[in-house]
């Protein structure tokens, strides 16, 4: 028995492969063509979110094969499986979006159940769309077996009449079309060229934001999260990940050794520096929750406030993920942040080395303008800002990257679901200067905390992005531009102040000092609360009903179970 098999006595897979009582289990493994040697090697789960719903995940199965080759070459036995994913680009703007955030929990739960049920010793997780990235990382830290995360890669930009375009331009084209600024023929032409390859949305939307997080938090190999999906180098990263996870097993380096409070602060810093998605303020607390670490929206916002915004990435800037990869990738961004004191260098990573050690060989690239030096930023504070006030006692979040005006005051225009707000935008029945309020769209009230990209993109397409504001207890896509505030808590469904608003109430937003208030006294709000009654949803059964019963507030990540702080034994220690 060699060194690879001799460690079996401390690994979970011993429960299904070792001893005479496991002869029935081994017979199943022989049925799949495994050799005796392979059965007694460490079992590595290779999980992907492959499906044919959208280009985001279509390349994942190919990459999984490369991971398996790496695992096998390093003396492990790869065991491939798939889990679900809900692609936001397809779910956006209709009832299907209610499934998006709950799918994050389903992904984490299904990966956990598969690994537990089959006693796998390690995990390489491959994800390609918004909720699958945090869902996979949540599973890794929950299980706490040696793990490496792999992003499936971003899509290449499209080309519309010589202009680089992304799916963001498609959603905004709908707004232009609604006001006669784009013809049917033009709309048809751009929709055929906007998304030319496999991969997730190419700008710094939620998928690329969480991909950036995966490197900064230490769960992904350096440079691996930046390469676009069609690039052949992705297979090399995947093969290396398969090899490296075997080293993690041997060294017994686990996700909770990597994902510490300081690593979470690093993750929040790269979100702010890259002008990333507000959804990170939901996903980072959820990942922390799996580790038993308290790290809520306010903790995230504190890091955002003191981190400079330095990456000129869409939607607030000019470039896409491919451009940043080609000038130095995420390590270039991290290098200048580290050199200027914005990252903790002593955090461990899946390389077995620290952040500082990984960045030691990274040289600054002066021949590019995608990433600025951290001491010469686009703005001195991050591209995402946390807010709090009498309208959001549990906080709210706004993406300010690319915005020039960070204050807004106006009368409320209230809608109790996104469809009604979108119809008002399409018909232009709103007024310039108003604050559009979309409520009962929170985690419990939606249920599912939908994103409002269809509405915000239509407003931008109509040229109103800087002339109105929008607040919601739901979420916004990473592709959203304009003064759009999400995650307002407490949500309307549980009687939060956003549910007490009436048309005409004056709302004051100040993203400079971080406040969100309505010009009502505490007594007026209390009087309205006494008259408020809960609303029923149309979901009285099924997965969304179950989610609504379990989900917690957005400020803590909208999680559905007690978390690592309450567990008595993590899976890796069975």
Language-model features: locations:
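Catalytic or ion-coupling anion/metal-binding cores of large enzyme and transporter domains
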Residues: 2-52, 56-58, 63-82, 89-90, ...
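Glycine-rich, N-terminal phosphate-binding loop and its surrounding beta-alpha-beta segment
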Residues: 71, 110-114
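Glycine-rich, highly charged phosphate/nucleotide-binding loops
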Residues: 100-109
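A short, small-residue-rich loop immediately preceding and capping a beta-strand
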Residues: 114-136, 148-151
């Amino acid at each position: 028995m060699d060194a690879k098999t001799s460690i079996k006595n401390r690994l979970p897979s011993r429960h299904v492969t070792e001893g005479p009582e496991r002869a029935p289990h081994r017979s199943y493994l022989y049925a799949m063509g495994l050799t005796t040697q392979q059965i007694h090697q460490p079992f590595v789960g290779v999980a992907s979110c492959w499906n044919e719903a959208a280009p985001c995940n279509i390349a994942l199965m190919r990459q999984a094969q490369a991971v398996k080759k790496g695992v096998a070459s390093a003396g492990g036995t790869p065991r491939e499986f798939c889990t679900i994913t809900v692609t936001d680009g397809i779910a956006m703007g209709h009832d299907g979006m209610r499934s998006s955030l709950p799918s994050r929990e389903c992904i984490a739960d299904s990966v956990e159940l598969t690994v537990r049920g089959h006693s796998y010793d390690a995990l390489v997780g491959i994800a390609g769309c918004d909720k699958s990235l945090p869902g996979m990382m949540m599973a890794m830290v929950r299980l706490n077996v040696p793990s490496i995360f792999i992003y499936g890669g971003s899509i290449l930009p499209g080309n519309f009449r010589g202009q680089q375009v992304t799916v963001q331009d498609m959603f905004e084209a709908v707004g232009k079309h609604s006001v006669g600024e784009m013809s049917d023929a033009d709309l048809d032409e751009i929709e055929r060229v906007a998304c030319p390859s496999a991969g997730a949305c190419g700008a710094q939307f939620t998928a690329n934001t969480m991909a950036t997080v995966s490197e900064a938090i230490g769960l992904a190999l350096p440079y691996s999260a930046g390469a676009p999906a069609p690039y052949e180098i992705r297979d090399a990263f995947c093969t290396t990940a398969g090899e490296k996870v075997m080293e993690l097993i041997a060294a017994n380096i686990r996700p909770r050794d990597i994902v510490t409070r300081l690593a979470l602060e690093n993750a929040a810093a790269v979100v702010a520096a890259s002008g990333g998605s507000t959804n990170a303020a939901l996903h980072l607390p959820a990942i922390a929750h799996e580790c038993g670490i308290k790290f809520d929206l306010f903790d995230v916002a504190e890091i955002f406030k003191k981190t400079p915004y330095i990456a000129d990435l869409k939607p607030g800037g000019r470039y896409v993920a491919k451009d940043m990869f080609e000038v130095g990738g995420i390590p270039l961004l991290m290098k200048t942040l580290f050199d200027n004191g914005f990252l903790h260098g002593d955090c461990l990573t899946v390389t077995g080395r620290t952040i500082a050690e990984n960045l030691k060989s990274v040289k600054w690239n002066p021949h590019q303008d995608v990433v600025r030096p951290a001491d010469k930023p686009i703005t001195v504070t991050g591209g995402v800002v946390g807010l709090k006030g009498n309208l959001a006692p549990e906080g709210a979040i706004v993406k300010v990257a690319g915005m020039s005006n960070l204050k807004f005051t106006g009368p409320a225009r209230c809608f109790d679901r996104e469809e009604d707000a979108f119809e008002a935008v399409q018909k232009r029945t709103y007024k310039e200067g108003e604050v559009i309020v979309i409520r009962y769209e929170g985690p419990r009230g939606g249920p599912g905390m939908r994103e409002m990209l269809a509405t915000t993109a239509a407003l931008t397409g109509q040229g109103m992005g800087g002339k109105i504001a929008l607040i919601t207890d739901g979420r916004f896509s990473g592709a959203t531009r304009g003064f759009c505030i999400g995650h307002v808590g407490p949500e309307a469904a549980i009687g939060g102040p956003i549910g007490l608003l009436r048309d005409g109430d004056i709302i004051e937003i100040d993203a400079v000092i971080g406040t969100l208030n309505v010009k009502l006294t505490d007594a007026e709000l209390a009087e309205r609360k006494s008259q408020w009654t809960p609303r029923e949803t149309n979901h009285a059964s099924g997965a969304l009903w179950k989610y609504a019963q379990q989900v917690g507030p957005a400020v803590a990540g909208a999680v559905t179970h007690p978390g690592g702080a309450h567990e008595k034994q993590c899976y890796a220690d069975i």
